[in-house]
Amino acid sequence: MIGPDGAADRLTDIMTEYLRDGASIYRRSFAIIRAESDLSAFAPDVAGVVVRMIHACGQTDLTRDVVATEGVVRAARNALTDGAPILCDATMVASGITRRRLPADNEIRCHLHDPAVPELAERMGTTRTAAALELWKPVLDGAVVAIGNAPTALFALLEMIDAGAPRPAAIVGAPVGFVGAAESCAELAARADLEFITVTGRRGGSAITAAAINALASPEE
């Protein structure tokens, strides 16, 4: 149906002229994000990570909720360049990491589906996602951590560190949800002894977390 304002003609023009080149789409997307977002609170290297996070969720007001330490980008990139593993709480986070951006063909680990995890979770009285972190301990020292699904995993990580577990080089902590997400991110944001980037409040998720890791892995947009 063609309306009096020529809406159908405009739709045809859009369908004919839409961008098809992937690189051009990325460049235009990042330009729009930078034009519409207030990134003034962030150092340039952190701002680059935040742009990627916004690109993953489509919400430019995410800048109001992102909290990051001054040295998180440097710490994460140094660790990844040295070959540190990336430890993920969920397979969706792991799947979202772009391997070609990794500087040292870094190992990506997610132990959620390890056969030992259900028994661990039952014994510990916690979620499987949190219990799976027990299997991180041998490689946690100097690793890059990506938690984008379960608040219980972020709480468990902070408890492990407080109990003397090795410290990761950097943490991306952005679990999503209505129960525990805001609280766990607030706990991380209050830590002066860790390098991190987090999203306060209920927002977060696997896509945002993986996008942050991809940005930390390489400065290339």
PLM-predicted stretches and their roles:
Residues 90-161, 169, 175-177, 185:
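Conserved mixed alpha/beta catalytic, RNA-binding, or beta-rich assembly cores of soluble enzyme
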Residues 172-174, 198-199:
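Thr-Gly-centered strand-to-loop micro-motif
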